Amino acid sequence: MADGKAGDEKPEKSQRAGAAGGPEEEAEKPVKTKTVSSSNGGESSSRSAEKRSAEEEAADLPTKPTKISKFGFAIGSQTTKKASAISIKLGSSKPKETVPTLAPKTLSVAAAFNEDEDSEPEEMPPEAKMRMKNIGRDTPTSAGPNSFNKGKHGFSDNQKLWERNIKSHLGNVHDQDN
């Protein structure tokens, strides 16, 4: 009778392992191996051995349940998880806070710009005053689009200056002769 009980226990274990699909079932199967020897460097025979081992694995695959790994973004599942975290209830009554309205101040334009009537006017540095002052022909800096050929003494025409100098020298020479 002890033999019968032991025989009964083994099928139960195999049934349990088969139902669970655990490692116990895989451990009971014998492992198949093949030795490959080649005389040409192992190129063609190693490839055929790889093909044979791949075919054997393909034959063993239908007996084992295959696990499919999902790769990608599950947008729908993420939105449902976030939706449970944030809930919006429509029709909920909350007391509305009354914002005190400020009376608009009506100021005249002069009052808006002349708020500091008591303060003294801003003091300008002398350099800024000098630049803003219209000196005329003796402008110290020649700047701007219309200041081409302008020197310290105004616009200068070298040809005219040369003619003036010649006339003055001729006049001086003519006066000395008389």
Curated annotation (Swiss-Prot):
The modification N-acetylalanine is found at residue 2. Residues 139-149 have a biased composition (Polar residues). Keywords: Acetylation, Cell cycle, Nucleus, Phosphoprotein, Ubl conjugation. Ubiquitinated; mediated by UHRF2 and leading to its subsequent proteasomal degradation. N-terminally acetylated in a HYPK-dependent manner by the NatA acetyltransferase complex which is composed of NAA10 and NAA15. GO terms for cellular component: nuclear body; nucleoplasm; nucleus. The modification N6-acetyllysine is found at residues 64, 150, 152. Its main location: nucleus. Residues 37-47 have a biased composition (Low complexity). Residues 1-15, 160-178 have a biased composition (Basic and acidic residues). The modification Phosphoserine is found at residues 53, 77, 87, 119, 147. Interacts with UHRF2/NIRF. This is PEST proteolytic signal-containing nuclear protein. It comes from Homo sapiens (Human). The gene is PCNP.
